[in-house]
Amino acid sequence: MSAIAATSTERPTRGAGLRIDQVHAHKGASAVAPENTLSAFRSAYGQGARWVEFDVSLLGDGTPVVIHDATVDRCSSSTGHLKDLSIKDLDAIDAGSWFDPFYQGERIPTLAEALECFAEFGLSGNLEIKRHKHQASVEELTGNIHAVLKDRDPSVRISISSFDVDVLKSIGAKDPSLELAMLWDKLPENWRDVLADIPTKVIHLNYKALTLPFLDEVVEKGLLVRAWTCNDPAELAQFWSMGLGAVITDEPRYFLSR
């Protein structure tokens, strides 16, 4: 998903009062803590969320880590491409103070560390696999991620999403029990053909591309739709009665409050 979420200019005055399974905290509670960090995941829990959306890619040594971009530049005090880093470099990277000095010393978590956090707090993970240019092959990317996932605490539920069809096919072949979600910013004209080609019944769609006719059709087909990344309950109010499954948001508190 985009590194920058759409936000309302004013704080909503009334929440949506949704069920906890309908609210996924985007990169954790990323409006109040540095995105994709353990602090953001704990903050999501503190706001009442029990599903956390987060991004995973590989370091140059093959370690799966929780980060959105192909570099550490935007969300840390350091610079450099993931492909040029190894796990031993993580301790020297401050992934918190860019957001607020309070979070100085926050680390980029490994996938294993994130899953341990989820197990501790009873969280489920909406894991977006990021495939960056000039990095690992699809097989290495999904293989290394799957190797960590299969050793997770069995209490941690995982849904896998990606913009990349090949990534979804690859990870799905490694574990057919995983829920797979197709990610789209805009709905392609051939969306029906794409979905027919992969074992998924879940769509993650930019909320700005969501329409009532589309939602009506996919719900009729038994598909689940989650809308990203919306921070104002009013923007999605008309869609819940039509079967919208969940929202992915930087502000889970707005959607869980009444």
Question: Which residues does each PLM region occupy?
Answer:
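Phosphate-group recognition and catalysis centered on beta-loop-alpha active-site segments
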Residues: 1-258
